[in-house]
């Protein structure tokens, strides 16, 4: 019995000893593990501090990079010519309700043929026009104006950011440039990320092989027509896809001042912008084999006189057109799908005087704030046929066209709701004046009465048989 008890005691002692050793080994293992982690952390803190501190910096940089990427549209707008107030919202869509979100421009392009969403997108764009006008009105101190004098087949200039080779001029810096003289076969090319102001001070450029002015890049280009001056631009009749117009710009174009600009396009468009076109003043006369005025984004006409005599479309725009002031005389071609005004995103007329004459024309939206008369003749009127629209004995619109036309849209402050208007075609005017096919004054006789039509509201559209 004692032997058995002794054996049991020895076995228990061995088990206890083994258990204690196992606990000590396990405890030692955990301790080493903790010690290892702690040492590793300490070593990292002491020996690898730059690496640890770099991690938050990398994370921070990543966040900053993301932030910059989110703002890239605004940055792009600032350097591509969309920094004007009229173009800033679509390019900087960062959740602003007025911009319609990033999908707005795309959806407009996709639905432009059906005309959907145009009323909701036109109004915000119009609200931005006054701010653009204010920016355009800023003046440059005389000491900061650079001069470019065109000397037929050479150029003389004063100021930085200008380079010249023969009759070719390059502008590579922002600023204000006053241009005078003439080039018989040359070009001004602009390539900068800054704003550029071109003061046309009695200048003329003809380029037989391309555009007269070619803006590759600029934040915004403003053309100031100096008081009392007559200026002209003309392109060649050879193919020049890269330029596509007598005056071509990749970015927003603002035209103002009180002088005159005559544009003749022998190959394609008169004035074209891949961004917006804003007309604030001056007298602009465009004669073009293709479109007179063309913009990929918006066109705003706020003042001045714009005359377009175009082989296809008087003015065309892929987004919206708003006519808010001035006098616009727009004449389109005779092909079925061509007209005085063609716009994919919607046309609004809120002021000024409008003559739109062509084979067809986009009808203004109901959101327009000025009364509009639209007449569609069942048979085209021959070229040079006079049309007269009168209220009683008071002539309101009298005009002709160098080409046959079927559609006429007119607007002016004299139109009233519920008033009646008489349309006459043919005949002649004695003693009046004819400017850009619009006739004022004189005595009208010999025309054919085509009927009297009563205004039915803001936009009145009639068929004339």
What are the functions of these language-model segments?
Residues 1-8:
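Bacterial N-terminal signal peptides that target proteins for export
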Residues 8-15, 21-43, 47-55, 60-74, ...:
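A composition-driven surface/loop motif
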Residues 2, 19-20:
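Secretory targeting signatures
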